[in-house]
């Protein structure tokens, strides 16, 4: 483990740096000169094409972060393995901000992967060992992603609660009312017709029955040829 050139006081501050001053002071990977290609030609390139201090580890798609300690030749600080390249890049920024604030980097400007890391990452302004820096970096990155998840959840909840329901237009309401009338009218009309036909049927039945009782029976029976038979037909003939 590399030693610390200048031992700082035990006082530490977890508040992020000022956004205005940090943005003017620190460079980012987007404004700094591009990274030089790796000198190794027989091995697969694992470094991230943009982010500093970040390289891929294995085929699982995970990323690791390791930074050079400014002012200490050949001294590197291992910061761990992360699920995303952004997590490793934020760890690099937190480490550089902590080392620079503690005087390990000479107090000058440092190159960051993200400009907003200067005020979004809560890093200590002093430390005693590089182990303290590693521990502070892990806490700063974890706190950053926790706050991001909370903000995203709050935004999703507020957007869903403020979304107004689509009002129904006059045409839709009129169409719904018309459909309701059409669906209810056949049943009522059918019941009305059945009642009317029932009353009319009974009236016709009683009228025809009374008319039949008033009619006289025929006076004589008719034969097969249509002539009337005047003689009575006996019931028995011997």
UniProtKB/Swiss-Prot annotation:
State the name under which the record lists this protein. Dehydration-responsive element-binding protein 1A
Here the segments flagged for biased composition (Low complexity) are 9-22, 155-167
List the top taxonomic levels of the source. Answer: Eukaryota, Viridiplantae, Streptophyta, Embryophyta, Tracheophyta
DNA-binding positions are 50-115
Which GO CC annotations does the UniProt entry carry?
nucleus
Region feature Disordered, mapped onto this chain:
1-41, 155-188
GO molecular function terms attached to this record: DNA binding; DNA-binding transcription factor activity
So which domain of life are we looking at? Eukaryota
Database matches in SMART domains: AP2 (SM00380)
Subcellular localization, as worded in the UniProt entry: Nucleus
Q: What is this protein's function per UniProt?
A: Transcriptional activator that binds specifically to the DNA sequence 5'-[AG]CCGAC-3'. Binding to the C-repeat/DRE element mediates high salinity- and dehydration-inducible transcription. Confers resistance to high salt, cold and drought stress.
The entry assigns this protein to a family as follows:
Belongs to the AP2/ERF transcription factor family. ERF subfamily.
Q: Which SUPFAM superfamilies match?
A: DNA-binding domain
Originating species: Oryza sativa subsp. indica (Rice)
Ranges of Acidic residues composition bias in the record: 170-182
Q: Which is one Pfam family of this protein?
A: AP2
Alphabetically sorted, this entry's keywords are: Activator, DNA-binding, Nucleus, Stress response, Transcription, Transcription regulation
